[in-house]
Amino acid sequence: MTRRLLWASLADQRPRRELHWLSLMPGTRVTALAAERPPGELDWLPATYRRPVRRFVEAGALAWVRELERLPPAYDWCASLELCSLVTGQVTRYARRRGLRQAVLTWENDPRQALYRLPPYRAATQAALAEADLFLCLVHAAADHLRVLGVDEARIRVVRPGTDLSLFRPAEDPVDEPVLAYVSPVALNKGVDRVLAAFALVRRRLPAARLRVLGRGPDELLVRAAAADPASGVEYLGGGDATRVAAVLREAAVFVTAPRSTWKWTEQFGLAYLEAMACGLPVVTTVCGTNAEIVVPPNERVIDDVEALAAALLRLLEDPACRRAVGTANRKYVEERHDQHVQAARMGAAFAEIEAR
C-alpha cells in the first residue's frame, strides 16, 4: 500500500533537500504544500504565507501557511522541518485534529537554541515535542539534542542525507590549476570574509591561485568589491542551481568555507561539503558546530583563524598528489554512505518502523 505524506514547506525553503529526499522514499506519494512547484515526482498544492517580517530565520521561519487547515485529511502522515518552525506548530494541530501521524525532520544540534525561548516558537516546539510520532534526525547531533530535550528513544531515528551521485561527480580529469571554490551562501556566518582574507595570503605565495565564489547572500558587496580588482584573483559567479553548482565544483581543485557560530545558529552538517566531496574535491573549513559529521580526515577543519585557513589551503594547492588522494577518498566515502536513493530507502524504513508499532 502506498504511504500518503503531506509536506508543509516553510516560507523560503530551499529546493532539492528534505522534501526531495522524502519524495524518493519507496512506496510513498508526497504532496507538497509550498509557495513554488518543487522539482521531482510529487504532487503540489500552492501555498501562501502570513509573515510578520520578510526574512528567514535559521532554525524556524516566522511565517504561517494559510492553506493547511483547509485541507482534507487525505493523508497518512504530515511532516515539516524543525521543531520551532511555526509551520511545525500548525502541522502538530492539523495532525492531532485529523488523526494523522506526524513527522518532524530536524538538523538542529543545540538544545540551548535561543529561539526555543521565544514565543511563538516556544509553543510550536513544545507541541511537537509532546505529540510528534517520528523525529527524523538528519545528523547524529540532532538525536543527541532531542534526548537532552527529553524525547524518548522510540520516536527518534537518524538517517543522514544523501546526494545525487550522477550529478555531483568528479571531473574526468583532475584540475591541476590552483583554483578554490567557495559554494555557499555569501554571508559572514559562512565565513566569506575569512575566506577572502585567507585567499589574499595564499596569493602572496601562489600568484596564480584563483578563488571562484558561487552563492547569494547579504554580503555579496564584499565579494563584488574583491572581484572588481583584476589583481585579486577573485571571481564572483552570482547564484546558480544544482547543475551549475556541480559544474563549478568540477572546475576547482579545493573546496573552502569558514563558518562560525551566531547567537541562533551553528553549523549542523553542510550539504555543500557533501556535494564537494562527491565531486572528488578535498575540503578545507573551520571547526564549527558539528560539521565533523561530514568533514572527516584527511579533510581539514582548522581554527577560526585566517592564517591557519591559508596554511591549510596552501598545503593542498602545493601538493597535487595529496589533493588527488583526498579527493578520491572523499568520493568513495560519499558513495558508501550518502547515495540519495539508499538514504531515501532508509528514511522510508524509519517511517515503516513507526507504522508497525
Question: For the regions a protein language model found, what residue spans apply to each?
Answer:
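Nucleotide-activated donor-binding/catalytic signature segment of Leloir-type glycosyltransferases, i.e.
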Residues: 223-246, 254
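N-terminal subdomain of nucleotide-sugar transferases
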Residues: 1-47, 73
